[in-house]
Structure formats: C-alpha cells, structure tokens
Amino acid sequence: MKVAVLGAAGGIGQALALLLKTQLPSGSELSLYDIAPVTPGVAVDLSHIPTAVKIKGFSGEDATPALEGANVVLISAGVARKPGMDRSDLFNVNAGIVKNLVQQVAKTCPKACIGIITNPVNTTVAIAAEVLKKAGVYDKNKLFGVTTLDIIRSNTFVAELKGKQPGEVEVPVIGGHSGVTILPLLSQVPGVSFTEQEVADLTKRIQNAGTEVVEAKAGGGSATLSMGQAAARFGLSLVRALQGEQGVVECAYVEGDGQYARFFSQPLLLGKNGVEERKSIGTLSAFEKNALEGMLDTLKKDIALGEEFVNK
C-alpha cells in the first residue's frame, strides 16, 4: 500500500507524515512531496524512526515521482489561515494549488483514493472533482474531503463537558467543513443527553474551533497538529478498508445523491474501492433539522465557486 502526502513540508503535512510513518501497516510505502526544497530532508529525518514503512521525499514543481503507484493521496498543500481570515479567504491561493496537484494525480495515479485537506474544503473538493472529470478519470467513490477534524473536536468537547473518556464518544458530523456548514449530530451520541443551551453552545464551539486555534496562535499559524492527527485517522481508516478490513466507517465530504447538496459530509462505510456505502444521516432533532436547512445555501454557493473555478 502506497500513501502519498502532497504538501508534506507544511505544518499539517509534517505532523501527518510523522503519524503515518509510525502507524501505517508494516510494508507500506510513504511518499512525501512539497514544492519546498526541505522535503527530501523531512523524509530522511522520518526514515530514522524504526518502523517497517519505507519513506521517500520529493521536491520541486513536479509531483509525478511521488505519485507513481500511489493507492492513497492526501493533499494538504496550500496557505494557512491568519487571524481575521476565514476559510474562504484562502480560496484565492489554494484553488490554484489544488487544481494543479489534482491534474498531476489524474495523469499519474488516476485510480488512487484522494483525500483533500486543503481549505476551503467545501470548495476545493468541487475543484478536484471537476479536474478529474475533465481528465475522464472521476470516480465519486474515491474523492473525499477530509472533515475528520470536526469529528475529533466534537468527541473531545463532548467528553470534556460530560466527564467521559474521549475514546468512548463518537459524534457524527454532517454538512460541510466551515462555519455554519459544520453540523455535529449531538442527538445521536449514545448514552449522553444535552440541554438545549448545551447543544447551541457546543455546536457553536465546534463550528468556531478553527478560529479558536488561529487566535490562540496569535498569527503564528492555524490548526496543524490536531489536523495532522485527524488526517492520519482518516488516511489509516482508508488504508485498512482498501486492504479488506470490514466495517470501517468514517464521516467525510463526498459526492452523493444530491439530496442536500452535490457534496455533503456524512457517515461512509469504506471498502476496497473507496466508498462502499453512503450511510443515512438518521433522525435529526428539531435544532439539527433547522441548522441543516439554514446551511444549504452557503454550502451550495461554496460548491458552485469550485465548479466555476475549473470551468470558467
């Protein structure tokens, strides 16, 4: 199994590469790519960690050598948020980066599963889909927007509030991956109940958690370490499913039946070909139904922005 990380010299990329080097199954290959010249050195640094995961690093304009034979490609390349920016301010720079990298994936490893981490995910996934479609290699079961950070944050905040072990809590999060489009389904957490005020406060905290980190880092960056962990969790789940493990479920932002929007984050059963089954979002509370209705315009606009970027 070969995993390629594009944007591997950045804050998320390095954290992700470290976790994959220590946690990928024995015999896996890990390939790191970034435009930055430091990237082969990041691979050398990680190669000293004693795990049976082969690692190589590549830098420069051409990602092809890193992509050859890749089964999973995780894309974290792009600029990070600064205070006062929201994820959509990133669009102007990151849209071009994602388009370029996905074009290279389409040429070199068109059958790979692709996880898009680069923000704004609501839009960059639509860009990736249109690029793959133009290249004639789009498979909607193999393109994912990685929203796992919303899930791990939800799990952490709920566990803190309710005095649970974080490992015992799994909150499904649906919708998109920024602001109001992030909808944690708190009504579906088994064995935990919330007051209306708790639901409102938690939902808001989960939606604004990225900003919490950006502000706390005082201009020094955005959420890189928790995002690295989230991306590793998603990437490792995908690898296990591709290798035939049964019953692997993760939420991610994918193209579905279009009931709510063309792309929508929901629980997915993963399998040997990527998405095996898009699972139902279940029964929503009145608060959740309302929040879902209220986000769809924003989500659809975000998606249209990505489609137009490629097709203009």
Swiss-Prot record:
Enzyme class, broadest EC rank: oxidoreductase
NCBIfam families: MDH_euk_gproteo (TIGR01772)
Keywords recorded for this protein, A-Z: NAD, Oxidoreductase, Tricarboxylic acid cycle
Positions annotated as active site in the UniProt record: 177
Oxidoreductase listed as a keyword: yes
EC numbers: 1.1.1.37
Biological processes annotated in GO: malate metabolic process; tricarboxylic acid cycle
PANTHER family: MALATE AND LACTATE DEHYDROGENASE, MALATE DEHYDROGENASE, MITOCHONDRIAL
Name under which the protein is recorded: Malate dehydrogenase
Name of one Pfam family that matches: Ldh_1_C
One MF term in the entry's GO annotations: L-malate dehydrogenase (NAD+) activity
Binding site for NAD(+): 7-13, 34, 94, 117-119, 227
